Amino acid sequence: MVLFNRNLIISGIAGYFSGALGAQLYSMYDNNMLVNAIVALLSEYCVDIPFFVITFYIDNKYGHHDPIVGKKNQAFSKQNIKNLVIAISVSEAFYAVTKIFTHYQFLHHAMEPYQAAMASSLIAWTIFIVLVNVIGKKIKLFHK
């Protein structure tokens, strides 16, 4: 669980700053607040997802070995990836809705786009981290 959360946080920090940059740069070209919120979210995803995949792969490329046989346990790895996709997909849906809604609201209250992106990311990340960990525990994603 610690490595999983560490990977999410590392990728989230990278996405956090790219979302703020994307929102601010988009605001120079157009004032559409909803599109600005969507651009910020997409900017985050363009950095966040690749970072998570890379850090997760590095941490797990030698994991899940069967100590008796000495080979990688393919069935366990596939089940673990399936559970990971479930936990992250559900949590990401909540993240995206929360992020876009709060970003849009902050822009309506005259926040700078980069500030709106950062504040909305913090709110959405709080919900995401709690939700992904609760779901992960329920579907037994984390093993001892």
Map each language-model feature to its residues.
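Juxtamembrane/disordered regions of integral membrane proteins
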Residues: M1-K144
